[in-house]
Amino acid sequence: MSLLTEVETPIRNEWGCRCNDSSDPLVVAASIIGILHLILWILDRLFFKCIYRLFKHGLKRGPSTEGVPESMREEYRKEQQSAVDADDSHFVNIELE
């Protein structure tokens, strides 16, 4: 017996659910959560580059530079920027002989 036949059964030539009590608070809550999950998933797929770039670069804060000389701060910024630049290059050229 498959899971499909246990959950959904043909009713008068149509596929339907045998949930007669759809006003149950648990069913309503599950429906709302399911709809919200679908909306968030669609938004994530549409804007994933913007969202993850924001989290990756925008929300990261380096260690406190209080009391650190300006030359060391500049060196740290250059290191961080070079790491970001290296991270953005996703493609590698490989030549085969």
Swiss-Prot record:
It is a single-pass type III membrane protein. The record marks W41 as: Seems to be involved in pH gating. Residues 59-85 are annotated as: Disordered. One of its GO terms (molecular function) is monoatomic ion channel activity. The chain crosses the membrane at residues 23-43. The keyword Phosphoprotein applies. Glycans are attached at N20. InterPro entries: Flu_M2. When the channel is activated, one or more imidazole moieties of His-37 probably become bi-protonated. Cytoplasmic tail plays an important role in virion assembly and morphogenesis. Homotetramer; composed of two disulfide-linked dimers held together by non-covalent interactions. May interact with matrix protein 1. Forms a proton-selective ion channel that is necessary for the efficient release of the viral genome during virus entry. After attaching to the cell surface, the virion enters the cell by endocytosis. Acidification of the endosome triggers M2 ion channel activity. This is Matrix protein 2. The lineage of its organism: Viruses, Riboviria, Orthornavirae, Negarnaviricota, Polyploviricotina. The gene is M.
